């Protein structure tokens, strides 16, 4: 495909639809080649010219300098295409040395290491020879039978014994016996393979085979046979006769100073091959002894292996400084490989980088660009404009003007950058808002100025961060930048739909100060007729900014001071006022005066605005007034915030850290409580573990109490009108948190040991008082761990993002409606009775699947209608519990997803458009906070924050208590005790609607009866969170079974207290099953005792229903690491099986216990129809179910995490999908990160696209093959249509890494991971990549098929009038391009034209 003429460069090679990869036949390799390389020499040591027929030969690969042959006989362009008769070099461009290949003819065939050694061995599979035997044949250690003749051996049998071979050879050679060794033998065998008949034969064998082991083996072989059958590849091409030599410029030899050369490793590897090949040729010509020739052939084979993949087999070849040589495979692999370094990540021109500083005077769509940078970046535009305006006539003159920085140049620069957006990017670019477009404003100095409000999106601060600038060149690029990427168009986060350009830090502080009321200020309580009077009084000094006043007002007023949530601007209804008085402050009047400049319809906002309130205000304005007004208002708030933060003069000093006066008293009380707990322990009432837990609990509570008191004090001072800057900063949300202030002026609290346990003696001091040496020492560990973790987790999170992007990159909105009839149900998320996320928030921006009706039967939302904010409020008002919506999980689009299943594009607030790359957006939205999760430790400095255990449930509403599925017994004290695990208690209002629902734990004490009226705050349930109790359901006498001292029981004597208690232990004899049997009037009942249970009763004792028989202490709590559950997220996305998973029941039924064998206890679940399932649970693990209890499918039989694959098998796809989405959301929710469900659903959809074939039927699938769902369905439909039997399969969930590697596109998979494996597989299959995803297109250098590059938007026809205009524009553009081309050509020829180009005047 090479082209020697430079004038053919215009012809386009991007005009193709697909790329195929396959094995190259020897003929193909020879046809690529421009000549055979026969000498190992590179360049001549004296002349530095390439040696003839060597690795850099100019005759084969092309001239070293443009338009010049090697000997210098032909120079200049006029001899184009001539082949020099003296040196044989063609006169052409030297860059053909980047594209011309050579070849090496091997004296003896060699195997290709990928196909022989890559697992599974393709050569081995197709010949049915084991890898070890194959290796011994290829490396001349054994013979393989090619022709058995009459000998008692089979074809392909491997003979390892030399003497045996000799005997057979002597005896049977006349009858045609032939055995060979080396690649020749294998090649001979491969030639005879007929893929077609092999395929048929294997399918027959599979049908008749009963052993699963053998069937799987046949399936593996069949896979390789099918690959050859379907592709044009021939098996013998896996053995090489000819090796291609890649172009010399791609394996350069660079002169260093000092006369030495740096060379690419490939040259060394090629030299080895050539040397050994030449030596082998000589030996063969000399008819050398077989042994020597064989040895040489083996060495040649090893050299070829090393060239293709160094270190795959045998020793790694090392270079001069003991560094392994980089082979061809290594050039492709890894982050530094061809794919990731050069194809996916290219460096671009017209870019620069510099330090950033804040530019508070900028508008949201502007950035400050240093003049020096702008001058360099916009050079071509300046040259062109200088020529146009007649300031100069040639490019050369323009260049001189710019270099001398003439005054006219600056004016031209101003003109050029007007309306020419630039892109700013801050690394790491974690989501799409890491690159935004701005209109440049020229600034002095060398720093880029950026608007303070975009810092959140870029995650930028001004402690030395740098940013890169890129210039969009083509008109299309400029339009896209200003329409799609302008900072003022990107104020919503694509992850959650919340505003992301929200004021932070100083601005929040200023706004808080401005809207604060300070009693006792000058002029308090004065009444004003309108805002203008207030401003006048302020100017005259009659009132202060914080003075509370009364203002007469006409218009809408949003009074946050009376609202339930005083920051909830979005949901507070404005009330119309008619010349009525508002109690407000001067500052709030100033704020509203400013806000009304953006729009006159703005309601008067009366309230103290904190960070959350300002965020909600931005959201409110965006929803009500749209983008333009929001942007104006943001700039108003920015200016006001900075202005008043400055005017307030807030600063902090040590006296602002107010220590609560009765801190000492509280701490003393705590010490007394701890001592009493210690005493209980000494008396033997509690175990050591319980003591520890209680002590930790006490100190946690005290730390909170001290902090609350301190905060309360600050609040009192604040109300009294004394401003405490530290309190103001934390309360406003500008900087610092309650936790940090607690450490400054409360107490530092509990710290963690390096092992992660909590040290039970807390640091009672704070930073203001100062720490003792011991306290300081205890603190250091936490602080250091924080720093170390941050560094490690950032890398993990980045890798997670990479995998997510890879698995979802080709999910694009491909059609408007896929016509599915399936959807998912959503309802509010409730955790321990609290509504964490109301239904209203979950359905906004989704599309309803069916009519949503209220209880009267009125339609609230229609079919396929997008649920807007108003409709969602309607749903909430109607009290609807759950709705069915469309989701990407149930979308039927074969490629990508459809707009209706996806719903709203969160970044724009409208229904998603065709071509939107929602997969990448989803991946970024999940990955970006991953880095945030990981960087979180940092600030709290390792203080142990334990989630204090909940031990009771209080009613949150008035209503009626109802029990659901609760089994209870009445204890002797008269209260009810819960005896099962899957029950719940709810509170119902007078209309019968469920207001709250709580799952109730086993062993909990109920403080209410079924149907009892409860009041708000009433205790309903209590339990002990630190131990797990086993209770009796019946009264009677205790009898021990298999509980013998020393065998299954041991007495633990506490060293401190001297008291003993019995603890159950594992017995070496498996027949013994420790249990307590209660014999009562109502019969007998047996309770199995797990190991580590502490017995609370004695043999023969009398017990009553609900009494505790044994306690199992819970593990002592360790502090939650800041992995922020990052490992948990990875575990879920990778579909890993967690360690020690819980066994779940596959059927509904009744529990029956079996015997223990081999360390496993058998549990049977018997269904109503008598079928039973058997489960094995490790002995000594606490079993969650009682004998005779009824359980449902999917219920856990023991404690532990669930295995997602089990959920899929037992409960099906929908259950698993909702499990994954909720589990992942939970991790993020704990961190306070808001991500829309649809992003997680998008990734989960990609994980669950697969089916594993269990029975092939009459289709072309293979057993155990994993297939795309849609392809599976299509093949089955085809099979049924032709009267065959369809295949059956089971749904399969793949982790994101596996799913990425299973994609149709081999280019995408190879650039992700395991490059060699992917390419080996693809080339055998003759795989065709249709370039449908994003990555493949980036790699081959085309526009990505998403966004404006989507097919749908290409080839759009225009009306005739527009057509004419477009034609004209096109001609003008074409003309401009031609001028530029001419100018470039002149610049190129400047150096070599003798005439000089001063006289050449371009028009």
Swiss-Prot record:
Sites binding Mg(2+) sit at 461, 463, 465
The protein's matches in InterPro entries, at most eight in alphabetical order, are given as: DNA-dir_RpoC_beta_prime, DNA-dir_RpoC_beta_prime_bact, RNA_pol_asu, RNA_pol_N, RNA_pol_Rpb1_1, RNA_pol_Rpb1_3, RNA_pol_Rpb1_3_sf, RNA_pol_Rpb1_4
Sorted keywords for this record are: DNA-directed RNA polymerase, Magnesium, Metal-binding, Nucleotidyltransferase, Transcription, Transferase, Zinc
- Free-text comment on the cofactor: Binds 1 Mg(2+) ion per subunit. Binds 2 Zn(2+) ions per subunit.
Binding residue positions for Zn(2+) 1: 69, 71, 84, 87
Q: What class of enzyme is it?
A: transferase
For the keyword Repeat, the answer is no
Which cellular components does GO assign to this protein? DNA-directed RNA polymerase complex
Q: Which reaction does it catalyse?
A: RNA(n) + a ribonucleoside 5'-triphosphate = RNA(n+1) + diphosphate
Q: Name one GO biological process term.
A: DNA-templated transcription
Where do the segments described as Disordered lie? Answer: 1384-1403
UniProt: Zn(2+) 2 binding residues? 818, 891, 898, 901
Q: Give the Enzyme Commission number.
A: 2.7.7.6
| Record carries keyword Transferase | yes
Pfam families the UniProt entry points to: RNA_pol_Rpb1_1, RNA_pol_Rpb1_2, RNA_pol_Rpb1_3, RNA_pol_Rpb1_4, RNA_pol_Rpb1_5
**Requisite cofactors:** Mg(2+); Zn(2+)
Q: Where is the composition biased (Acidic residues)?
A: 1391-1403
Q: Which GO terms describe its molecular function?
A: DNA binding; DNA-directed RNA polymerase activity; magnesium ion binding; zinc ion binding
Q: Which family does it belong to?
A: Belongs to the RNA polymerase beta' chain family.
Biological function: DNA-dependent RNA polymerase catalyzes the transcription of DNA into RNA using the four ribonucleoside triphosphates as substrates.
Q: How does it assemble?
A: The RNAP catalytic core consists of 2 alpha, 1 beta, 1 beta' and 1 omega subunit. When a sigma factor is associated with the core the holoenzyme is formed, which can initiate transcription.
User: What protein name is recorded for this chain?
Assistant: DNA-directed RNA polymerase subunit beta'
Gene symbol here is rpoC
């Amino acid at each position: 495909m090479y082209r020697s003429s430079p004038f053919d460069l215009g012809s386009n090679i991007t005009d193709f639809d697909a790329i195929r990869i396959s094995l190259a036949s020897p003929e193909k390799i020879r046809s690529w080649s421009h000549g055979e390389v026969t000498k190992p020499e590179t360049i001549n040591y004296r002349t530095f010219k390439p040696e003839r027929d060597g690795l850099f030969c100019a005759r084969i690969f092309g001239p070293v300098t443009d338009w010049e042959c090697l000997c210098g006989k032909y120079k200049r362009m006029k001899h184009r295409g001539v082949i020099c008769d003296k040196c044989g070099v063609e006169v052409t461009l030297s860059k053909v040395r980047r594209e011309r290949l050579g070849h090496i003819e091997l004296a003896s065939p060699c195997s290709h290491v990928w196909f022989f050694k890559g697992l599974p061995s393709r050569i081995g599979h197709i010949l049915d020879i084991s890898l070890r035997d194959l290796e011994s044949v290829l490396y001349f250690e054994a013979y393989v039978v090619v022709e058995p003749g009459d000998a008692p051996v089979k074809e392909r049998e491997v003979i390892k014994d030399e003497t045996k071979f000799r005997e057979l050879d002597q005896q049977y050679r006349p009858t045609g016996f032939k055995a060979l060794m080396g690649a020749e033998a294998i090649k001979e065998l491969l030639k005879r393979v007929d893929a077609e008949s092999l395929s048929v034969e294997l399918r027959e064998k599979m049908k008749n085979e009963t052993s699963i082991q053998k069937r799987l083996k046949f399936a593996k072989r069949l896979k390789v046979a099918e690959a050859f059958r379907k592709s044009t590849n021939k098996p013998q091409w896996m053995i090489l006769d000819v090796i291609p030599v890649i172009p010399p410029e791609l394996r350069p030899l660079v002169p260093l100073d000092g006369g030495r050369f740096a060379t690419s490793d490939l040259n060394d590897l090629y030299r080895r091959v050539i040397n050994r090949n030449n030596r082998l040729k000589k030996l063969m010509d000399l008819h050398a002894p077989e042994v020597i020739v064989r040895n040489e052939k083996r060495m040649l084979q090893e050299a070829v292996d090393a060239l293709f993949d160094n270190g795959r087999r045998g020793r790694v070849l090392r270079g001069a400084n003991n560094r392994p040589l980089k082979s061809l495979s290594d050039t492709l692999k890894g982050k530094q490989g061809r794919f990731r370094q050069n194809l996916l990540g290219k460096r671009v021109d017209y870019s620069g980088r510099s330090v950033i500083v804040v530019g508070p005077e900028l508008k949201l769509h502007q950035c400050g660009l240093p003049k020096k940078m702008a001058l360099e970046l916009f050079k071509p535009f300046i040259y062109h404009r200088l020529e146009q305006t007649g300031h100069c006539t040639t490019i050369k003159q323009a260049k001189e003007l710019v270099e001398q920085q003439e005054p006219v140049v600056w004016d031209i620069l101003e003109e050029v950058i007007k309306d020419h957006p630039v892109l700013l990017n801050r690394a790491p670019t974690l989501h799409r808002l890491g690159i935004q477009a701005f209109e440049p404003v020229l600034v002095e100095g060398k720093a880029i100025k950026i608007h303070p409000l975009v810092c959140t999106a870029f995650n930028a601060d001004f402690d030395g961060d740098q940013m890169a600038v890129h210039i969009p060149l083509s008109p299309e690029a400029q339009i896209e930048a200003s329409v799609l990427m302008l900072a003022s168009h990107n104020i919503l986060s694509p992850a959650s739909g919340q505003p992301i350009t929200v004021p932070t830090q100083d601005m929040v502080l200023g706004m808080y100060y401005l809207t604060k009321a300070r009693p006792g200020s000058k002029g308090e309580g004065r009444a004003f007729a309108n805002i203008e009077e207030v401003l006048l009084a302020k100017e005259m000094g009659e009132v202060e900014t914080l003075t509370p006043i009364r203002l007469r007002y006409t218009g809408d007023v949003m009074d946050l001071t009376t609202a339930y949530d005083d920051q909830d601007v979005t949901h507070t209804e404005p009330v119309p006022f008619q010349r009525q008085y508002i109690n407000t402050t001067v500052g709030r009047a100033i704020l509203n005066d400013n806000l009304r400049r953006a729009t006159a319809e703005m309601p008067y906002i009366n309230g103290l605005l904190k960070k959350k309130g300002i965020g909600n205000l931005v959201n409110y304005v965006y929803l009500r007034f749209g983008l333009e007004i929001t942007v104006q208002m943001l700039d108003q708030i920015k200016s006001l915030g900075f202005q008043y933060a400055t005017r307030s003069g807030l600063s902090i000093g040590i006296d602002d850290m107010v220590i609560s006066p009765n801190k000492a008293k509280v701490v003393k009380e705590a010490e007394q409580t701890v001592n009493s707990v210690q005493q209980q322990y000494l008396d033997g009432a509690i175990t050591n573990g319980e003591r520890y837990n209680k002590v930790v609990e006490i100190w946690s509570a005290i730390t909170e109490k001290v902090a609350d008191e301190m905060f309360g004090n600050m609040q009192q001072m604040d109300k009294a009108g004394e401003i405490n800057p530290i309190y103001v900063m934390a309360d406003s949300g500008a900087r610092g948190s309650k936790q940090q202030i607690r450490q400054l002026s409360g107490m530092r609290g509990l710290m963690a040991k390096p092992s992660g346990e909590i040290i039970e003696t807390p640091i009672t001091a704070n930073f203001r008082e100062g720490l003792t040496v011991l306290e300081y020492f205890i603190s250091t560990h936490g602080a250091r761990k924080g720093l170390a973790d941050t560094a490690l987790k950032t890398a993990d999170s980045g890798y997670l993002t990479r995998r997510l992007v890879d698995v979802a990159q080709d999910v694009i909105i491909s059609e408007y409606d896929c016509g599915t009839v399936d959807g998912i149900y959503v309802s509010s998320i409730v955790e321990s009775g609290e509504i964490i996320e109301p239904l209203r928030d979950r359905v906004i921006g989704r599309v309803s699947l069916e009519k949503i009706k209220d209880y009267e039967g009125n339609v609230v939302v229609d079919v396929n209608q997008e649920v807007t904010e108003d409709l969602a409020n309607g749903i909430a008002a109607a009290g609807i519990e759950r709705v069915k919506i469309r989701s990407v999980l149930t979308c039927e689009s074969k490629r990508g997803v459809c707009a209706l299943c996806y719903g709203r594009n969160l970044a724009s607030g409208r229904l998603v458009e065709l071509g939107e790359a929602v997969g990448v957006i989803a991946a970024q939205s999940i990955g970006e906070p991953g880095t945030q999760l990981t960087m979180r430790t940092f600030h709290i400095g390792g203080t142990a924050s334990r989630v204090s255990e909940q031990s009771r449930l209080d009613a949150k509403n008035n209503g009626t208590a109802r029990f659901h599925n609760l089994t209870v017994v009445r204890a002797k004290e008269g209260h009810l005790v819960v005896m099962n695990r899957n029950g719940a208690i709810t509170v119902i209002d007078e209309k019968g609607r469920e207001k709250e629902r709580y799952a109730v734990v086993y062993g909990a004490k109920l403080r209410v009866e079924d149907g009892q009226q409860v009041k708000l705050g009433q205790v309903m349930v209590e339990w002990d969170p630190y131990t797990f109790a086993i209770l009796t359901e019946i009264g009677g006498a205790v009898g021990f079974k298999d509980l013998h001292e020393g065998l299954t029981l041991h007495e633990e004597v506490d060293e401190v207290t001297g008291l003993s208690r019995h603890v159950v232990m594992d017995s070496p004899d498996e027949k013994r099953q420790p249990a307590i049997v209660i014999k009562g009037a109502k019969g007998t009942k047996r309770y199995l005792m797990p190991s580590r249970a502490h017995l609370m009763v004695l043999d023969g004792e009398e017990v009553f229903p609900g009494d505790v028989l044994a306690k199992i202490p819970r593990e002592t709590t360790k502090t939650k690491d800041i992995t922020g559950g990052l490992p948990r997220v990875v575990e879920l996305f990778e579909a890993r099986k967690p360690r020690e998973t819980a066994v779940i029941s596959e059927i509904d039924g009744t529990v029956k216990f079996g015997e223990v064998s081999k360390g496993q206890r058998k549990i049977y679940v018997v269904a109503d129809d008598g079928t039973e399932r058997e489960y094995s649970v490790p002995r000594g693990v606490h079993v969650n179910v009682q004998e005779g209890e009824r359980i449902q499918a999917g219920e856990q039989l023991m404690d532990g995490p669930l295995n997602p694959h089990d959920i899929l098998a037992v409960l099906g796809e929908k259950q698993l999908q909702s499990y994954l989405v909720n589990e992942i959301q939970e991790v993020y929710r704990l961190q306070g990160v808001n991500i829309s469900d649809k992003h997680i659903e998008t990734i989960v959809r990609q994980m669950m696209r697969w089916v594993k074939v269990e029975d092939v039927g009459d289709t072309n699938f293979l057993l155990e093959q994993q297939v795309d769902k849609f392809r599976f369905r299509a093949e089955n439909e085809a099979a049924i249509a032709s009267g065959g039997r369809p295949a059956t399969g089971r749904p399969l969930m793949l982790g994101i890494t596996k799913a990425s590697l299973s994609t149709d596109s081999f280019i995408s998979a190879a650039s992700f991971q395991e490059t060699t494996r992917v390419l080996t597989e693809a080339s055998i299959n003759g795989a065709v990549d249709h370039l449908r995803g994003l990555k493949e297109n980036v790699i081959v250098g085309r526009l990505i098929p998403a966004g404006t590059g989507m097919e749908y938007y290409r080839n759009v026809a225009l009306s005739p009038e527009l057509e004419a205009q477009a034609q004209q524009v096109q001609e003008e553009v074409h003309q401009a391009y031609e001028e530029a081309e001419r100018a470039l050509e002149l610049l190129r020829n400047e150096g070599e034209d003798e005439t000089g180009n001063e006289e050449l005047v371009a028009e």
